[in-house]
Amino acid sequence: MNIGFEFIKYSLIAKGRHGIHSPFVYNLCDQVLRKPISEEVKSRQNRLFKTLKNDATIINFEEFGAGSKHLKKQRSVKQIVTTNSTKNKYGDLLYRLMEAYKPMNVLEFGTSIGCGTLQLHWGNPEAQLISIEACKETYEFAKKTMEQHQISNQVQLINSTFNDYLEEKDLEKFDLVFIDGHHDGKCLIEYLKKLEKHTHNDTIFILDDIRWSTDMLNAWNTLVNDEQYHLSIDFFKMGLLIRQSNKRKEHFILRK
């Protein structure tokens, strides 16, 4: 996939808040995406990423999904954080969505070293957050990070594959689901299918790396055209889906 060409296409058609007639999406643009993040939270974010960028801890990766051909199986934490999308404006998007909509039961697929997990928690510290990570060493590092930030009571980390976790029978109904792992289009669609019984009409699904590969972009386009998702929003790197069966189907390509 030519990511530069994809970005040019996206930039030419992406909208801001003007010309949007959906009340929900207009509010998202006007009151959520444009809302300033407090200096306290910004300071917290900066301290986290400064610490991680200087962490030479080596993690041996077990690849359970479609790992990038350009990334080694053994990487330092400071190498991992340079490719982590939740350290920039997309991390701010996670924070703002959590802060604005106050989801109380949250599921994250793909803890990695815990950056996205912390952004989700900081957005709504009252939420009960479950985060799944299949790689044992990555899970152990993220666990230490949660302990250092003293949020182990609000964040439950589980060392499991996504499929094994979804086999459990007594799962909560989740208000927000963030999927950042595996990077296989077919599997992404299968996970969302399995999550149907564990989510509700207003559950917000956030999908990371929708342009990771042609396969992932094809999966995203399939989901956009799926009649059960009545709202879909393309933020270029991330995509957002909500079922909202009481609303007419709409798709938006928004500038972040």
What residues fall within each predicted segment?
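A short alpha-helical cap/connector motif
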Residues: 1-176, 183-204, 210-256
